Amino acid sequence: MANIEKDHQKVILVGDGAVGSSYAYALTLQGIAQEVGIVDIFKEKTQGDAIDLSDALAFTSPKKIYAAEYSDAKDADVVVITAGAPQKPGETRLDLVSKNLKILKTIVDPIVESGFNGIFLVAANPVDILTYATWKLSGFPKERVIGSGTSLDSARFRKDIAEMVNVDARSVHAYIMGEHGDTEFPVWSHANIGGIKISEWVKAHPEVKEEELVKIFESVRDAAYTIINLKGATFYGIGTALARITKAILDDENAVLPLSVFMDGQYGLNDIFIGSPAVINRSGITNILEIPLTDHEMESMHKSAKQLKDIVTKAFEELDIETRQ
């Protein structure tokens, strides 16, 4: 793969909509990467955003930001795909499958043809299916194709638990797993606050009823619908989540993050990308942490996987998409 050097790290962003521009802004504010190229069919928008973001550099750190072409991906370390049809009010992420698969093929093919040899990071929805499709279309090793997965869902989960117990969200350790969507599920069995299991915390606080925990998860699961109904789209949260994942890659962190990753026997699943905690560094995914799930959680994982697999199989058959693997 591309040699990621500390003194020059390059990201190509494909998709300059609300999510893409929020991600580029997060990279700029946090000083992540030294070169960011933005690709979109609306070239004037990418040119405008490149100038606008560059105006912030005197307040952050040096960075080359520009309107790019697919050919610029040839020496990039990471290509981030946010392009796709947006989720409309009342529409599920899975409703987007056919149209976004068609869009994805027009993106992956020219990037691969450019000679790109880095890591694909996919955020377009439905992210688990489009990450799988990126892997199939690119012919890349599974370790170097990653989806944002349940990273945002897990962040929402931690935030809501933190608000319930009045602690910093960074001190809450909890995961949402499965599909980034309606069949996702909370891993309550391993959730903890500063090392104290949620189950133990609830025992010590009888005023907290089980119904409150159920409401927390439902709020997390339905958060996108709530935000979309209020303002039309979600972008700040996922933009920041993507910046965090990018930093873990470029800085070779070996960070554990909940991502959409390829299952090769883990949790009894195969040939599917789905949300699970995994170790990520400059080589991509180095290890999938197979958390010991309860019977109910494992059942939820398999239910989520079945739905994803059924949809992706049907979509590939109907669209007759040619793949590289």
Swiss-Prot record:
Keyword annotations: Allosteric enzyme, Cytoplasm, NAD, Oxidoreductase, Phosphoprotein
Major localization class: cytoplasm
Cellular component GO terms, alphabetical: cytoplasm
Enzyme Commission code(s) on record: 1.1.1.27
Gene Ontology biological process terms in this record: glycolytic process; lactate metabolic process
One Pfam match: Ldh_1_C
Activity modulation: Allosterically activated by fructose 1,6-bisphosphate (FBP).
UniProt family annotation: Belongs to the LDH/MDH superfamily. LDH family.
Name used for this protein in its record: L-lactate dehydrogenase
Primary gene name: ldh
